[in-house]
């Protein structure tokens, strides 16, 4: 696997091309209360367990300041990342959870440049 592919989030595992995703979430009031009641709870371990159960590999898991509370990086397939989102949302632990796939921006903008050549503006 090339260095550029790895930098763009393309990972090869057991002969399959895997993607890299960032999940950015806001925890629920229920989880916030549970965390306050048991501040030593190992959220990393429980997050890793459910992530792996969805078929993903947990790369990182961080609590952050700001509009959102947690950011994690996972490797796998898109459907697996969506399954993880559904699982967390249905558990009531997360109020909001976004899934962002790492893309090859050079390829995206090359495709956009090619598509732009076919745009015909009205009156031209």
Residue spans of the language-model regions?
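Short, Lys/Arg-enriched N-terminal segments with co-localized hydrophobic residues
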Residues: 1-17
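A compositional/biophysical signature of low hydrophobicity enriched in polar/charged and small residues
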Residues: 14-124
């Amino acid at each position: 696997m090339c260095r550029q592919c790895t930098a763009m989030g393309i990972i090869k595992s057991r002969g399959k091309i895997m993607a890299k995703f960032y999940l950015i979430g806001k925890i629920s009031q229920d989880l916030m209360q549970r965390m306050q009641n048991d501040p030593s709870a190992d959220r990393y371990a429980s997050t890793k367990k459910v992530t792996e159960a969805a078929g993903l590999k947990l790369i990182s898991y961080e609590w952050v300041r700001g509009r959102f509370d947690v950011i994690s990086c996972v490797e796998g397939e898109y459907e697996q990342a969506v399954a993880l989102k559904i699982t967390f949302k249905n558990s009531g632990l997360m109020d909001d959870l976004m899934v962002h796939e790492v893309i090859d921006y050079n390829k995206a903008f090359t495709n956009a440049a090619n598509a732009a050549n076919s745009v015909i503006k009205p009156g031209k």
